[in-house]
């Protein structure tokens, strides 16, 4: 969203259930439905972005919803190192996934942003020092709960 605002766009959020777009960007008299994807999977020198949906936060029924370019106008992708792409939906080939970082979608790469947090990274230990630790679970388990 920050990138769209930096380009002069207004940002609007759909109210209620909106399975096909995450937000609406307004540029003058034009509205664009935007779907956002994040990716930390880096294999074979490319970011392997999954663009299909496999249930989300609901219990998975086994049905895969493939990407359909008619459902949104742009796909905005942020990858682990902060690189970003704003890809017109019509330019996306494939319904399950795309590989970014090579020549195919390079014309749609925009300015990088902040890197994504490392989901496997170690958090620093707590520096909380309680004077009366009796009965505190940290006495047995340490500072990492």
PLM regions and their residue ranges:
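A structural signal for short, well-ordered beta-strand segments and their strand-loop junctions
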Residues: 13-14, 35, 86
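Short connector loops at helix/strand junctions that flank enzyme active sites
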Residues: 18-20, 29-33, 69-72, 80
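Catalytic cores of nucleic-acid endonucleases
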Residues: 37-84
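Conserved catalytic cores of phosphodiester-cleaving nucleases, focusing on short active-site segments
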Residues: 4, 23-25, 30-40
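A short acidic/basic microdomain associated with nuclease active sites
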Residues: 1-26
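Domain-level recognition of nuclease-like catalytic cores that cleave nucleotide substrates
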Residues: 70-107
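Short, positively charged low-complexity motifs
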Residues: 138-144
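Phosphate-handling catalytic interfaces
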Residues: 95-133
